[in-house]
Regions:
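Structural signature of nuclease core domains in nucleic-acid processing machines
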Residues: 1-200
Length: 200
């Protein structure tokens, strides 16, 4: 089912680090990048559930509460980045009404004769008639030129998630992708990338 917003057109503030100023602390400050990434994730979690005409006001109100010291231009840059993601027609299945946000996943997978515990959070999960699509957001990161430039740690993360989901959906193919918000660019991982292999 679609997550409920209980009739509200607002976004609740998350419990995160104290706000940081990009003027005083600088955009390269780790706390600034962390807060920006958390806000982007929260906006991508909630905004798809709101009517399009309500998204901008809800986003501005939320970002202003979470980052009151940010210049207006910096806040708008974040909001526009998220809005650009939601407006890409090719991304529509990711944010379809039946998709789910922030899906907790836990279990064990077998790798190289060992059973490894896996505990994570899938940013977006879309279950369709013939496939299951899991998407992880990457914020504040350079966009890889192509799939071969994706860090191995990110590939491995998605491979572990895919391995946990496969037994739950035996009649559907499992697909995974990384969504870089600064593009926005969606890099789909090929089946080879989702195969679990011992670390080199």
């Amino acid at each position: 089912d679609r997550p409920s917003t209980a009739g509200s057109q607002t976004i609740e503030r998350f419990e995160g680090p104290a706000w940081r100023s990009p003027v005083l602390d600088g955009p390269a400050d780790p706390a600034f990048a962390l807060l920006r990434g958390q806000m982007a994730h929260r906006l991508l979690q909630v905004l798809p559930n709101l009517a399009e005409e309500a998204r901008a006001d809800a986003a501005r109100s939320y970002v202003a509460r979470c980052a009151p010291a940010w210049p207006a231009a910096e806040r708008e840059k974040l909001i526009e980045e998220v809005d650009a993601v939601l407006r890409v027609p090719a991304f529509a299945p990711i944010f379809a009404p039946a998709s789910r946000a922030e899906v907790a996943i836990a279990g064990t997978v077998e790798l190289d004769g060992r059973r490894l515990p896996v505990n994570g959070l899938i940013d977006r999960l879309a279950v369709e008639a013939d496939r299951v699509l899991l998407v992880d957001y990457k914020t504040n990161r350079p966009v890889p030129q192509d799939g071969t430039a994706i860090p191995e740690a990110h590939r491995r993360q998605m491979a572990l998630y895919a391995a946990l989901l496969a037994p739950l959906f035996p009649d559907r193919r499992i697909e995974a992708a990384l969504l870089y918000t600064e593009g926005p660019v969606l890099h789909r991982l090929d089946p080879e990338a989702l195969s679990l292999k011992p670390a080199a």
